Amino acid sequence: MIWMMLLAVQTVPANYDAVAVAPGSHHILMEDERVRVLRVEIAPGATEPVHDHRWPSIMYFEQPQPITYVVYKLVDGKPVETRRIDAPPINVGQTVRAEPEGLHAVSNRGSAPFVAVRVEFKDGRAVGAGGPTP
């Protein structure tokens, strides 16, 4: 998906980890040395804090809603918005692979909570139906 590829090009400092800076929307379901499984929940009308995802992942959309990705870059050590991308419609049960994502936030434009499960692969390889992806 193009909007996810646009987010993958940035390098950011460690203090923007999704769980650390956006704990209200990123809940750890399981974590070990190889994977981290997150439940992502964003209330209707809410925008989560600016954060990143350092590892490739697979996302399963449990309760998709219309969302806007807000992309940021660091300027003098502070995040500055660079663009907004209205994501294409997402279907219930849709699953996508994602590369590591740079600084961004997600706004839920829908009338119900946005809910997804993200499996992050700490070894840098997302596994899917076609096997490992380096």
Write out the residue ranges for each language-model feature.
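Short acidic-glycine-tyrosine-enriched beta hairpin
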Residues: 30-34, 73-101
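Histidine-centered active-site/metal-ligand motif
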Residues: 51-53, 104
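Sec-dependent N-terminal signal peptides
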Residues: 2-10
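Short N-terminal segments immediately surrounding and downstream of signal-peptide cleavage
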Residues: 11-33, 132-134
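Asparagine-centered strand-capping/turn motif at beta-strand->loop junctions
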Residues: 106-110
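Mature N-terminal segment immediately following signal peptide/propeptide cleavage
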Residues: 23-51
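Extracytoplasmic/periplasmic copper-protein system
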Residues: 123-134
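Glycine- and acidic-residue-biased ligand/ion/polar-headgroup-sensing regions
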Residues: 54-78
